Amino acid sequence: MKARAEKIADGLYWTGVLDWDIRNYHGYTLQGTTYNAYLVFGDEGVALIDNSYPGTFQELMARMEDAFNREGREMRVDFIVQNHVERDHSGVLVELHRRFPEAEIHCTEVAVEGLLKHYPALEGTEFRTVKTGDSIDLGGRTLTFLEAPLLHWPDSMFTFLDTGILFSNDAFGQHLCYPQRLDTEIPEYILMDAAKKFYANLITPLSKLVLRKFDEVKELGLLDKIGMIAPSHGQIWTEPMKIIEAYTAWATGKVKKKVTVIYDTMHHSTAMMAHAIAEGAMSEGADVRVYYLHEDDRSEIVKDILDSHAIALGAPAIYDEPYPSVGDLLMYLRGLKFNRTGQRRAMVFGSMGGRGGATGTMQKLLADAGFDVMEADEIYYVPNNEELDACFEAGRRLAGDLNE
């Protein structure tokens, strides 16, 4: 096959893979993504930074061949940099090793075990393990490594090219699939929304590590040298401070006067309550988002929770327990640990036909997830006007608390 590499800067090409078709990746909904790989040409050596998902070797190689042809160079890779073990960035490493057997594979020490577990065919391969500050000289260009454990796997690392380009792997990524490669080539609201969704679903529990890593980068004197951030998914940041400032805001829990209302319903009673709560919150001037779990996806929901000061979560009771879709969301929220970016208020609500008690379970699970749970509003069967008025007032109180 034929495919074109995208020249990003002198001696630097994007040689990744466009996945137009993917719609779900480990529970995260998306409209396609990219698996970004980069070829760096020095006077004496060539490095490939990261690779792509299993089954995409031909597309990756076609772009690499185009880059070598345009540079007028023999197709030879001297270094393979594996910033992260996960299969969407290492999935064709075995094929690359067979194609370029002399290429040194550079990764963290923790990554070696993970790569061998994922790819037993690499058993016996000599890996070059690196630590923060280690570097490789390509001839006129130097790649320096920066360990980044748990951003977002224990094996993760960043690679810095001395011309000012940070290859950050998953950090600063977005699940977008556009033929354009740069941040400035697509609408900013689409770019930032995708980056926010990526952070909310993948980086939120690691927020304290994000801030510590920023401090480390400053101490190493690299922050002012970063002129471009090239992540492993989505667009390349040519204005890197834009995403660094956004990550700082998200990691420190900067929120808006905003209430996210989330519910599921069987016979529309809980839906009536949800809409009344939303109206109450809006009456206090809050920005409000309403999600219906029967139709809406949790990865979109948590994107709005990220910058909300409060949430309202509603479910009908089934045998005195929350509706299953709400239980699923509660487990997801517990894993994301939103309290690590500051505590958010929460209320729970729902309708019941028996003894009730589902709201008590929801309160406990939300507290376990790090939310400051205020109150529960549970009604019997269909809410009457008086009960809907009470829901409206609950929404007002929830939004009013944002002014405290």
UniProtKB/Swiss-Prot annotation:
<dbReference type="GO" id="GO:0016491">
    <property type="term" value="F:oxidoreductase activity"/>
</dbReference>
<dbReference type="Pfam" id="PF00258">
    <property type="entry name" value="Flavodoxin_1"/>
</dbReference>
<dbReference type="InterPro" id="IPR045761">
    <property type="entry name" value="ODP_dom"/>
</dbReference>
<protein>
    <recommendedName>
        <fullName>Coenzyme F420H(2) oxidase</fullName>
        <ecNumber>1.5.3.22</ecNumber>
    </recommendedName>
</protein>
<keyword id="KW-0479">Metal-binding</keyword>
<dbReference type="InterPro" id="IPR029039">
    <property type="entry name" value="Flavoprotein-like_sf"/>
</dbReference>
<feature type="binding site">
    <location>
        <begin position="351"/>
        <end position="356"/>
    </location>
    <ligand>
        <name>FMN</name>
    </ligand>
</feature>
<keyword id="KW-0408">Iron</keyword>
<dbReference type="GO" id="GO:0010181">
    <property type="term" value="F:FMN binding"/>
</dbReference>
<feature type="binding site">
    <location>
        <position position="152"/>
    </location>
    <ligand>
        <name>Fe cation 1</name>
    </ligand>
</feature>
<dbReference type="InterPro" id="IPR016440">
    <property type="entry name" value="Rubredoxin-O_OxRdtase"/>
</dbReference>
<feature type="binding site">
    <location>
        <position position="88"/>
    </location>
    <ligand>
        <name>Fe cation 2</name>
    </ligand>
</feature>
<feature type="binding site">
    <location>
        <position position="89"/>
    </location>
    <ligand>
        <name>Fe cation 2</name>
    </ligand>
</feature>
<feature type="binding site">
    <location>
        <position position="170"/>
    </location>
    <ligand>
        <name>Fe cation 2</name>
    </ligand>
</feature>
<keyword id="KW-0288">FMN</keyword>
<dbReference type="GO" id="GO:0046872">
    <property type="term" value="F:metal ion binding"/>
</dbReference>
<feature type="binding site">
    <location>
        <begin position="317"/>
        <end position="320"/>
    </location>
    <ligand>
        <name>FMN</name>
    </ligand>
</feature>
<keyword id="KW-0285">Flavoprotein</keyword>
<keyword id="KW-0249">Electron transport</keyword>
<dbReference type="GO" id="GO:0009055">
    <property type="term" value="F:electron transfer activity"/>
</dbReference>
<dbReference type="Pfam" id="PF19583">
    <property type="entry name" value="ODP"/>
</dbReference>
<feature type="domain" description="Flavodoxin-like">
    <location>
        <begin position="259"/>
        <end position="399"/>
    </location>
</feature>
<feature type="binding site">
    <location>
        <position position="233"/>
    </location>
    <ligand>
        <name>Fe cation 2</name>
    </ligand>
</feature>
<dbReference type="InterPro" id="IPR008254">
    <property type="entry name" value="Flavodoxin/NO_synth"/>
</dbReference>
<comment type="function">
    <text>Catalyzes the oxidation of F420H(2) with O(2). May be involved in O(2) detoxification, reducing the intracellular O(2) concentration to a level allowing growth at the expense of methane formation.</text>
</comment>
<feature type="binding site">
    <location>
        <position position="84"/>
    </location>
    <ligand>
        <name>Fe cation 1</name>
    </ligand>
</feature>
<feature type="binding site">
    <location>
        <begin position="265"/>
        <end position="270"/>
    </location>
    <ligand>
        <name>FMN</name>
    </ligand>
</feature>
<dbReference type="InterPro" id="IPR001279">
    <property type="entry name" value="Metallo-B-lactamas"/>
</dbReference>
<keyword id="KW-0813">Transport</keyword>
<feature type="binding site">
    <location>
        <position position="170"/>
    </location>
    <ligand>
        <name>Fe cation 1</name>
    </ligand>
</feature>
<dbReference type="InterPro" id="IPR036866">
    <property type="entry name" value="RibonucZ/Hydroxyglut_hydro"/>
</dbReference>
<comment type="similarity">
    <text>In the N-terminal section; belongs to the zinc metallo-hydrolase group 3 family.</text>
</comment>
<feature type="binding site">
    <location>
        <position position="86"/>
    </location>
    <ligand>
        <name>Fe cation 1</name>
    </ligand>
</feature>
<keyword id="KW-0560">Oxidoreductase</keyword>
